[in-house]
Amino acid sequence: MNSEPVMPIMSDKQKEATSLIVEQLAQSGIKLVASLPDDWIAPLISAVDKDERFKHVPVNREESAIGLCSGAYFGGIPSLALMGASGLMTCIYAITKINYSYHIPLFLFATLRGVIGDPRPHHIANGLYLTKLLDSISLPFFLVEERKSIERIPAAFKHCQAMNRPEVVIFTEAVLLGEA
């Protein structure tokens, strides 16, 4: 049995967008990526997994990614928690309890699900409430709605570290597909 991760089939535009995101992560100094699968970020997860510049740790719960990345901070390892919108929404307690209480920076990537174009009705609540929820707990985020915004990733990571607080980069499907 081959343990190599299978790279999802991607268009050239999607490969280009994924590569750009990966390069921005490397430029940020990220060394560890903890991820929970989401179909929109599967190509990004696969690319990070195959890239020797990163240690990729798949997790089975979003809170595990929060704990792993928070612990990595104390070990001096720049990290990223990578998950879908619903996963991020389930970890709000862990983020406020651990990262807010102890001023631990946490850099997160999430998808913006449940918006126009997302065919899955079970993600509607994500589209309605994700950014409002983040605003309600004063968790800084920026929405990547066009390709040029990908280049802001290193600045967002630096901001997160300077504040000693979490920060989220939220991607639209169009950006992840290389269509925006």
Kindly label every feature range from the protein language model.
Residues N2-A180:
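Thiamine diphosphate
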